[in-house]
Amino acid sequence: MAIAWMDSYTRWAADFRGEHLRSWMRDHTEVPAVAVVLYLILVLYVPENVMAHRNPIKLRFLNMLWNLLLTVFSICGAYYCLPRLWEVLTSPRISGLMADPNLGPNAPPPKLPGSFYNSACAWNDKIFFDGFVGLWVAAFVLSKIPEMIDTVFLVFQKKPVIFLHWYHHATVMLFCWHAYAYTISSGLWFATMNYCVHSIMYFYYFMCACGMRKVIRPIAPLITMMQILQMVAGTLIVLYTYVKKQFMGEFCAVNNPSLRMGLLMYVSYLFLFSQLYYRSYISPAAARTLRMANGEKKGK
C-alpha cells in the first residue's frame, strides 16, 4: 500500500503545474480575505468574549501532534527546495527548463546559468513552479492558512498571543497568496528559508509540548536569531529585485505591488523579531529573569 501511495505521489508531483493553481488563486481572492477576517475574530474577540470566564482547554496531545506534523512538513519542503535553490545559484546550467512556446514546438530550452540574479529575477515555470519543487512551493503558500491553527492552540489554552505572532501569521498569508497569484521570481528563496527555519522552530515547539521545555530552552535564542537572519536575507533580496527592476531597468519577474508589500513586510518583521530578541534575551528585565531562574535551579 505504501509503495502504491508513493507511486501515485511521484506521478502527481511530477505532473504538477503551478499555472492551474495560480489561475484558481487569482479567481478566489475572497479565500485569504475571509481567512484573515476569521483569524482576527479569533485573536481580538474570542479571548475576551468567549474564553474570559472559561478554563483553559487541555490540548497538549493535539498540540504535540500538530507541531510534529509541521516539523515533518517543513523538513520535506526543505528537502525539495534547498537543493533546487543551490542549483539555481551555482549550476553552470539550470536543469529541466521549459522552452518558450512562442518560439515554436521545436524550440530548445533556454541555457540559463546559475547565479544570484537568476535565483532572484529569472522566470521559467520549471525553476520552481512545476514538478516536485513546484508542488512544495505551492504547499508552502497554501500552508499559511492552516498554520493559523498555531493561534487556535494559544487562544483556547488561554496563553498570550503577542502582536508579532498574529501580525506575522496574517500578513505572511496575504502576501504569499498575492505573490504566488501574480508571479514572484524570488519565491524559491522565501519558501526555502521559511521551510529551513520552520523545521527547527516547530521541532522546538514539539519538544516543548512534550514537556521538555527546560531541556531545550537554551536553543530558543538561536531560533529567534535564525528568524532575524531570515528577515535580513528577505529584506536584502526584495531590495535587490527592487533596485534591479526600478533603478537599473533590468528584467525581474515580480510585480510592483509585491515588491512594495514584500519590503514593508520584511522590514516590519525584522524590527519586531529584533525587538523580541532584545526583550527576551538582552534587556535588563530578561537578565533578571535569567538570574532568578538560575537561582531557583541552584536552590533546588
Swiss-Prot record:
> What is the active site of this protein?
H168 (nucleophile)
Membrane protein topology class:
Multi-pass membrane protein
- Keyword Transmembrane present in the record's keywords: the answer is yes
Q: What catalytic activity is recorded?
A: an acyl-CoA + malonyl-CoA + H(+) = a 3-oxoacyl-CoA + CO2 + CoA
Where on this chain is HxxHH motif (motif)? 165-169
Main EC class of this protein?
Answer: transferase
Tell me, which GO biological process terms does this entry list? Answer: fatty acid elongation, monounsaturated fatty acid; fatty acid elongation, polyunsaturated fatty acid; fatty acid elongation, saturated fatty acid; sphingolipid biosynthetic process; very long-chain fatty acid biosynthetic process
Task: Quote one Gene Ontology molecular function term.
Answer: fatty acid elongase activity
* Entries under Pfam families matching the protein: ELO
Q: In which pathway does it act?
A: Lipid metabolism; fatty acid biosynthesis
Query: PROSITE patterns given for it?
Result: ELO
Spell out the subcellular localization from the entry: Endoplasmic reticulum membrane
Its EC number(s): 2.3.1.-
Q: Which residue ranges traverse the bilayer? A: 31-51, 61-81, 127-147, 170-190, 192-212, 219-239, 261-283
Highest taxon listed in the record's lineage: Eukaryota
Q: Name one GO cellular component term.
A: endoplasmic reticulum membrane
- Family (UniProt): Belongs to the ELO family.
Described function: Involved in the synthesis of fatty acids. Elongates C14 fatty acids to C18. Required for the maintenance of the global lipidome profile in this parasite.
Could you tell me what this protein is called? Fatty acid elongase 3
Q: Which organism is it from?
A: Trypanosoma cruzi (strain CL Brener)
What lineage, starting at the top, does this entry show? Eukaryota, Discoba, Euglenozoa, Kinetoplastea, Metakinetoplastina
